[in-house]
């Protein structure tokens, strides 16, 4: 039989990670923008951290910069940004900020079929360099196809200004690749889902690299930020190879999104994924204790009470997490987990 398999992969072309690299934005824009108009999606705080300097650099070139100050990553705000920028003959879109601003920018770039530059101001999760955008509607998070960044500019001198909690959450998000890949392998074995061994290996390597460097990460200097960020980038690249988010999103992310749907809003994405990773590894009958110890060493709690969560909220999130993305098969199965099984898993792992 003639071999007919093919796949298109998109990767970042210009990646700058390190001290004082914001000024490289002009090089990346010059090489990739189709016009002299640039759209920047940012927030009030992140504008002061990095956006203002980027505007000054580009405006002196000169580029016409169109700023869009965005709120949460939801479909309402996406529509608002689209309406604000409809008449702009933009040649490139830049996202400056944390996960929400970057998700909105990458989705906007995808919808407009424009190149996208990711400029994170904190290393809080692995969406910095992935082709997926997480947007919410009615409290539910949906994973949408977004533009893979043509450029990533991660300035450690900017990112170090974020609280350590954000760095720890980003590290936890990368570590959660362990359970995501286990779910992917399970879906491949039981459902015949397409599997990429190279994407899985890159994803797992990123997680193990972070685990092996917890002591360095805890120092919380620019080197710590660089270490976590480079593995976040590798995780995003794994998703680009796979053509989907499987290398970095499994049952632990479904659980995280179920918590969000239940109204939990005082946890960072990586913290929710850490909690989900522990219960996922327990269900996989893997060494969840080891990973729980790693999270504790990072300073990431997986105990519901430390976030003020009611036990019933966590129990119901676990029971119904599978329904967040019913097409994504994981260790959670295809129907609601029994109440007793959910309680047992959460109690034995120390989550409740």
From Swiss-Prot:
InterPro entries found in the cross-reference section: G1P_dehydrogenase_arc, G1PDH, Glycerol_DH
Stretch forming the signal peptide: none
Cofactor (UniProt): Zn(2+)
Function, as annotated: Catalyzes the NAD(P)H-dependent reduction of dihydroxyacetonephosphate (DHAP or glycerone phosphate) to glycerol 1-phosphate (G1P). The G1P thus generated is used as the glycerophosphate backbone of phospholipids in the cellular membranes of Archaea.
Keywords: Cytoplasm, Lipid biosynthesis, Lipid metabolism, Metal-binding, NAD, NADP, Oxidoreductase, Phospholipid biosynthesis, Phospholipid metabolism, Zinc
Protein name as annotated: Glycerol-1-phosphate dehydrogenase [NAD(P)+]
Stated family: Belongs to the glycerol-1-phosphate dehydrogenase family.
Compartments (UniProt record): Cytoplasm
Pfam families: Fe-ADH_2 (PF13685)
Record: residues binding Zn(2+): 173, 253, 269
E.C. no: 1.1.1.261
Catalytic activity: sn-glycerol 1-phosphate + NAD(+) = dihydroxyacetone phosphate + NADH + H(+); sn-glycerol 1-phosphate + NADP(+) = dihydroxyacetone phosphate + NADPH + H(+)
Gene Ontology cellular component annotations, sorted alphabetically: cytoplasm
């Amino acid at each position: 039989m003639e071999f007919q398999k093919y796949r298109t992969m998109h990767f970042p072309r210009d990646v700058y990670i390190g001290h004082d690299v914001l000024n490289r934005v002009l090089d990346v824009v010059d090489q990739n923008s189709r016009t002299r108009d640039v759209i920047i999606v940012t927030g009030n705080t992140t504008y002061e951290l990095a956006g203002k300097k980027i505007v000054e650099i580009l405006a002196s070139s000169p580029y016409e910069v169109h700023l869009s100050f965005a709120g949460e990553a939801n479909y309402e705000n996406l529509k608002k940004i689209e309406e604000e920028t409809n008449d702009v003959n933009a040649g490139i879109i830049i996202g400056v900020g944390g996960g929400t601003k970057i998700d909105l920018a990458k989705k906007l770039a995808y919808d407009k079929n424009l190149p996208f530059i990711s400029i994170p101001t904190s290393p809080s999760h692995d969406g910095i360099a992935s082709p997926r955008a997480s947007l919410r509607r009615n409290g539910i998070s949906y994973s949408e196809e977004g533009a893979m960044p043509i450029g990533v500019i991660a300035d450690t001198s900017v990112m170090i200004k974020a609280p350590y909690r954000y760095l720890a959450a980003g590290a936890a998000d990368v570590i959660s690749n362990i359970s995501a890949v286990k779910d992917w392998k399970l879906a491949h074995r039981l459902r015949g889902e397409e599997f990429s061994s190279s994407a899985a290996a890159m994803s797992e390597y990123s997680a193990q690299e972070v685990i092996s460097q917890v002591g360095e990460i805890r120092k919380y200097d620019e080197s710590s930020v660089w270490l976590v960020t480079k593995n976040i980038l590798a995780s995003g690249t794994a998703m680009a190879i796979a053509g989907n988010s499987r290398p970095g999103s499994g049952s632990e992310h479904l659980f995280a999104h179920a918590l969000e749907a239940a109204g939990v809003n005082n946890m960072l994405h990586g913290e929710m994924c850490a909690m989900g990773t522990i219960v996922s590894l327990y269900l996989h009958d893997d060494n969840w204790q080891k990973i729980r110890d790693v999270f504790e060493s990072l300073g990431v709690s997986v105990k519901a009470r430390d976030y003020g969560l009611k036990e019933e909220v966590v129990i119901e999130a676990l029971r119904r997490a599978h329904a967040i993305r019913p097409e994504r098969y994981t260790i959670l199965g295809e129907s609601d987990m029994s109440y007793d099984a959910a309680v047992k898993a959460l109690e034995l792992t120390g989550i409740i």
